[in-house]
Amino acid sequence: MDKKFMALALEEARKAFDSGEVPVGAVVVRDGQVVARAHNLRETDKDPLAHAEMLAIRQAAKDGWRMRDCTLYVTLEPCPMCAGALSMAQIGRVVFGAFDEKQGCLGSVYHFLADPAFYHQAPAEGGLMEKECRELMQRFFERRRGD
């Protein structure tokens, strides 16, 4: 089931890619149903906070901001801002595709959702469909450098 939802997140990431955004996509699932889908819109919206995770959290929060019964699927390991937002939303679980060795905050640089200093902890699993997620990111940056 995880792979099915990560494939949807990858569809969102492709939308970002096609519109010149860093290709990150996110899907929030509750009880086996998709309740939110989003992709990066930082360039489009001229908003540094318009990361896929933030947009998906906002959509999903319309049914209530506590998301302990939700799983977030995202194509790239969340950054510090998004990891903090996931904690504040009390997300139940996070599954991500590619690791982010430079600013990933669910295991690569730091593990925000595993830190007992914060109120909410949640499991996070990385590497699902990692190859596909990483290749899309690499294609984006190769294209960007070529422009």
Region spans (language model):
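A short, polar/charged loop-to-alpha-helix boundary motif
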Residues: 41-55
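Short loop/turn microsegments at loop-to-beta-strand junctions
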Residues: 22-24, 70
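Zinc-dependent deaminase
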Residues: 1-19, 65, 81-147
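Short beta-strand scaffold segments in enzyme catalytic cores
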Residues: 24-32
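Immediate flanking context of iron-sulfur cluster ligation sites
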Residues: 64-76
